[in-house]
């Protein structure tokens, strides 16, 4: 079966932005103008086509990236039909993982900014992620009808804050409630969209006299930017001071594809103005799958390789998202980089080392689906029937195995205990959490061995709220959620020798175990470089403690280690040496020596200066210069130690070590200190001793 659309006419794009820049509305308008969605879904009615999870419609924010396929031939039908695959991405900081995952599989992006609030914190995060994956992008300054909207101010902010080389290809006519249309700087005409038919048709009119001069200045800047694309264009421009429309398009496209410039468009999606021109921009300036560098991968032996975007190359695709669908079960969204996959084909998953069969393939439109027979290089689709696939896995031809880059997922930073409200829900809860964890790699589930509780961990408080919410709605499990927890540990600080004797006489056979144990701090690491928890050494000579009882002594010490000696937290970093003791022919038993061992640790640890340890996190905060002092002051108040500072395009980077116990609520706090412009990440670094006053409180709360 030949291709319906040539690969050059594909565009895989993401629409990304900060919460509330109007990203979902922009996507809705794209679906409307491309003829897919006859009634435009308004976000504030909770009816947007792309926001298909209930929580999204309720909160008016987009949580999961829905993928949609649509077609466009231009505002004047000036292009052949192009196929545009769109991924709508969330803008909330707790869901950065979704954005990262989408950018990984896109060829280009439209970044939406609000005309009045301009560059916001999440836009800085998204921009950083797009830089990381080298994604060419164009900018749409939306909400030009809002009060305070100013297109040129937002372009200037993008230059200074995001260090991007912005080239406007349009200029707005009026702003706020007087926003009427845009000037096309390439054709030097004003575009006025028809309000009667929701902007489906438009008129080209002369540029208003008061904007003529500014339009000409901006046009000169744009032509200079286009001319820098090649020596031929530069020569032509220097000779005649002008370029033809085609040459301008050609020059701008070449520079966008090289990530040298970012073109800026403006409009108001809500008022049906400007989105159509952005669609033309996507076709004109963003790359087709075969115009971006071939995807890098590794062979099974770890040798570097790459896969060209071609149907003739062996099949390779990346599973970039999993979703559970109420009707068909698991959906695995894939981006096909090379080759062809037909429904019913077997694929190999080198990450899991398993072969799987693809049942059906569907093309998604938000959450409606059309079944298709095959997918080819450049396609984005969802497979039904894959059982053991995790986000970030590669699917490939079994005869020609490659592993695409693994996605790096951040470690969760916050944990809470959850328990089902009724015993009957226990199993349902386990199944629900398992499914949610497979869908979202930044969310983890584990059972705490000490308390038997189920602990869930994620990227932030909103992230975990939504997980608990989805358990309730999709899996009908009601759960109670505890407060965020810290995993403390205990250890000893000095060397001590301890005698312990367990003797019981109560008529008949008694109990007798007698040991001398030396306890000292253990500073050894295992083969992974992790600190060792416990080491037991046997130095008994002359059989004063018989061989068969030595294991019992070790076991008694180890059991007591798990229960701690100060506040019930497990002890780590302890070396125990059994060097003497005595036994009784009749009364000694394994049990007696086990109890003697645990008594020795209980008594000895107190003399060996036992103390409490807490997890210390490596925290990195990126903040604009203006808030540096406040952010550092706040870290100091949290018992943080500032290790160093760096510069980066988004501001200053502070590296600090901060106790986890002081980091709860930090996400909300750092946002309010920096008016939402600072972002942070943290990961576990080491255990360190807790200050005495805090240790006293921990022990007190344990004993009460």
Curated annotation (Swiss-Prot):
Domain of life: Bacteria
Keyword annotations: Cytoplasm, Elongation factor, GTP-binding, Nucleotide-binding, Protein biosynthesis
Gene Ontology MF terms in the entry: GTP binding; GTPase activity; guanosine tetraphosphate binding; translation elongation factor activity
Domain spans labelled tr-type G: 8-290
GO biological process: ribosome disassembly
HAMAP family: EF_G_EF_2_B
Family: Belongs to the TRAFAC class translation factor GTPase superfamily. Classic translation factor GTPase family. EF-G/EF-2 subfamily.
Task of the protein: Catalyzes the GTP-dependent ribosomal translocation step during translation elongation. During this step, the ribosome changes from the pre-translocational (PRE) to the post-translocational (POST) state as the newly formed A-site-bound peptidyl-tRNA and P-site-bound deacylated tRNA move to the P and E sites, respectively. Catalyzes the coordinated movement of the two tRNA molecules, the mRNA and conformational changes in the ribosome.
PANTHER family given in the database record: RIBOSOME-RELEASING FACTOR 2, MITOCHONDRIAL, TRANSLATION ELONGATION FACTOR G-RELATED
Protein name (database record): Elongation factor G
């Amino acid at each position: 079966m030949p291709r319906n659309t040539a690969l050059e006419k594909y565009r895989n794009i993401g629409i990304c932005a900060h919460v509330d820049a109007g990203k979902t509305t922009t996507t809705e308008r794209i679906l409307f103008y491309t003829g897919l969605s006859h009634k435009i879904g308004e976000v504030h009615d909770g009816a947007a086509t792309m926001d298909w999870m209930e929580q999204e419609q309720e909160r008016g924010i987009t949580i999961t990236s829905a993928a949609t396929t649509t077609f466009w031939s231009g505002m004047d039908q000036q292009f052949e039909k192009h196929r545009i695959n769109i991924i709508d991405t969330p803008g909330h900081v707790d869901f950065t993982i979704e954005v990262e995952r989408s950018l990984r599989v896109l060829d280009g992006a439209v970044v939406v900014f609000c005309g009045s609030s301009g560059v916001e914190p999440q836009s800085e995060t998204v921009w950083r992620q797009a830089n990381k994956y080298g994604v060419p992008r164009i900018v749409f300054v939306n909400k030009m009808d809002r009060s305070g909207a100013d297109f040129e101010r937002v372009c200037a902010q993008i230059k200074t804050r995001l260090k991007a080389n912005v080239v406007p290809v349009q200029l707005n006519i009026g702003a706020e409630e007087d926003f009427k249309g845009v000037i096309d700087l390439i054709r030097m005409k004003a575009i006025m969209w028809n309000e009667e038919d929701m902007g489906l048709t438009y008129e080209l009119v002369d540029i208003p006299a008061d904007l003529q001069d500014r339009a000409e200045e901006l046009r000169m800047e744009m032509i200079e930017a286009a001319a820098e694309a090649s020596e031929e264009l530069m020569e032509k421009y220097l000779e005649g001071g002008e370029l033809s429309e085609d040459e301008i398009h050609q020059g701008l496209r070449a520079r966008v594809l090289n990530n040298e410039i970012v073109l800026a468009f403006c409009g108001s999606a809500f008022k049906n103005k400007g989105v159509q021109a952005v669609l033309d921009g996507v076709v004109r300036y963003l790359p087709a799958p075969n115009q971006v560098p071939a995807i890098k991968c590794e062979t099974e032996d770890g040798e570097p390789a790459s896969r060209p975007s071609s149907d003739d190359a062996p099949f390779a695709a990346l599973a970039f998202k999993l979703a559970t669908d109420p009707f068909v079960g698991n959906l695995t969204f894939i981006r096909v980089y090379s080759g062809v996959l037909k429904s019913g084909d077997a694929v190999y998953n080198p990450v899991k080392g398993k072969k799987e069969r693809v049942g059906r393939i569907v093309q998604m439109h938000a959450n409606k689906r059309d079944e298709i027979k095959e997918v080819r290089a450049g396609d984005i689709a969802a497979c039904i029937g894959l059982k053991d696939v995790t986000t970030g896995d590669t699917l490939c031809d079994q005869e020609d195995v490659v592993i695409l880059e693994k996605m790096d997922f951040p470690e969760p930073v916050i944990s809470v205990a959850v328990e089902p409200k009724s015993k009957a829900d226990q199993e349902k809860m386990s199944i629900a959490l398992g499914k949610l964890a497979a869908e979202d790699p930044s969310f983890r589930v584990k059972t705490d061995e000490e308390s038997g509780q189920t602990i869930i961990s994620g990227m932030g408080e909103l992230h975990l709220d939504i997980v608990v919410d989805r358990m309730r709605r999709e899996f009908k499990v009601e759960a109670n959620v505890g407060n965020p927890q810290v995993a403390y540990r205990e250890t000893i600080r000095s060397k001590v020798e301890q005698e312990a004797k367990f003797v019981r006489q109560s008529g008949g056979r008694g109990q007798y175990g007698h040991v001398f144990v030396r306890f000292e701090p253990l500073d050894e690491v295992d083969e992974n470089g992790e600190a060792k928890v416990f080491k037991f050494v046997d130095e008994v000579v002359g059989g004063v403690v018989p061989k068969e009882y030595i294991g019992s002594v070790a076991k008694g010490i180890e059991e007591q280690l798990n229960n701690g000696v100060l506040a019930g937290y497990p002890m780590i970093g302890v070396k125990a040496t059994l060097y003497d003791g005595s036994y009784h022919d009749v009364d000694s038993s394994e049990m007696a020596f086990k109890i003697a061992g645990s008594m020795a640790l209980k008594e000895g640890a107190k003399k060996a200066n036992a103390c409490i340890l807490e997890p210390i996190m490596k925290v990195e905060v990126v903040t604009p210069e203006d808030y540096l002092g406040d952010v550092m002051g706040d870290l100091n108040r949290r018992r943080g130690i500032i290790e160093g500072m760096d510069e980066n395009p988004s501001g200053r980077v502070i590296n600090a070590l901060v106790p986890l116990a002081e980091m709860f609520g930090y996400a909300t706090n750092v946002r309010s200190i920096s008016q939402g412009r600072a972002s942070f990440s943290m990961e576990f670094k080491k255990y360190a001793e807790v200050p005495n006053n805090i240790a006293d409180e921990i022990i007190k709360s344990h004993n009460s």
